[in-house]
C-alpha cells in the first residue's frame, strides 16, 4: 500500500464517521452482517470500489 492509498482509505472512513450516529435499519444491518460473514473480502472490495469511483 502506498502512502496515497492509505490516505484515501483513512479519508473515506473519516467521511463515513460523521454518519456513525444516524439511525440504521436493523434488518439491513443484519442482512449485511450475514453477507459479510459469508464474503469476508466484501469490505475490502466495497472500499476499493468506492475509492475508484470517487477518483
Report residues per predicted region:
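N-terminal leader-region detector that preferentially activates on the first domain or presequence
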Residues: 1-55
Amino acid at each position: 500500500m502506498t502512502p496515497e492509498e492509505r490516505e484515501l482509505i483513512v479519508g473515506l472512513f473519516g467521511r463515513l464517521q460523521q454518519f456513525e450516529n444516524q439511525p440504521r435499519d436493523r434488518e439491513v444491518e443484519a442482512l449485511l452482517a450475514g453477507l459479510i460473514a459469508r464474503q469476508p473480502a466484501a469490505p475490502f472490495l466495497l472500499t476499493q470500489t468506492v475509492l475508484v469511483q470517487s477518483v
